[in-house]
Amino acid sequence: MKVMVLSLGKASPSKSDHELLDPFVSLVEFSVSPPGGFKDHPHRGFESVTYMFQGGIIHQDCNGNKGTIHEGDVQWMTAGRGIIHSEMPEEQVNKGLQLWINLPSSAKMIEPKNIEISSSEIPSADDYGVEVKVIAGESMGVKSPFYTKTPIMFLDFTLDPKAQTHQAVPESWTAFAYIVEGDEGVFSSSDSSTVQAHNVVVFGTGDEVSVWNTSNSRPLRFLLIAGEPIGEPVVQHGPFVMNSQDEIEMTIGDYRNGMNGFEMAKHWRSE
């Protein structure tokens, strides 16, 4: 299995990025403090997964959902046909990661949904110096109870010094790893070069992902994310992810006119 290392810092994925990482649209590691944050804004056509590393994010949306996720918690939001929400920092230092997952054309106009998953609800396993938290999918005999519209795997691994792991992944799926902590991880082949933290490793075709922590003293933490490609055109315009430019223009019109999923646009404001 070949790998490609990407830096996480590109604000606007290109068409080739979408094809390479299908069904994933974007991955962003964030650090936000008051008075900053993400004030009221719309979305359509995808799902987002927010995973907290430190602090807390207060979430509100136009459907009456309100809550706060803290370290180890997950917010899984299906934007579907339309949602307006805010994401604001709770503490002075708030860090996490947000993944956008595309929806197939048949599901882009489904009803929006928001699920908060506390860290205590996320199943985990620990064996031979390898710990995994199973946010979506299955690993080390443990399966997540949470259903995802687009089939994906979202695993949070921590490897002790000199530990290794081998994770099965469906051969047709897109798979990549994001290194959260540790600079001596080796991916795919034991003789590959080490990859530093805050980089993305994109895996080639294969049915297994292998990872070694070559450090003598430091743990290696990484997220392994994989999903079934949708194979449809992707056109992204800011917070909207559709299949064509015509659909993007229709979405902008729906938002401006408060219709087809954006009925609350003219009246709703977060607290």
Curated annotation (Swiss-Prot):
Name the Pfam families on file.
Answer: Pirin, Pirin_C
Return the CDD domains for the record: cupin_pirin_C, cupin_pirin_N
What keyword terms does UniProt attach to this protein? Nucleus
Organism's domain of life?
Answer: Eukaryota
Give the CC-aspect GO terms: nucleus
Query: InterPro entries from the entry?
Result: Pirin (IPR012093), Pirin_C_dom (IPR008778), Pirin_N_dom (IPR003829), RmlC-like_jellyroll (IPR014710), RmlC_Cupin_sf (IPR011051)
What is the annotated localization of this protein? Answer: Nucleus
This protein's name: Putative pirin-like protein At3g59260
Natural source organism = Arabidopsis thaliana
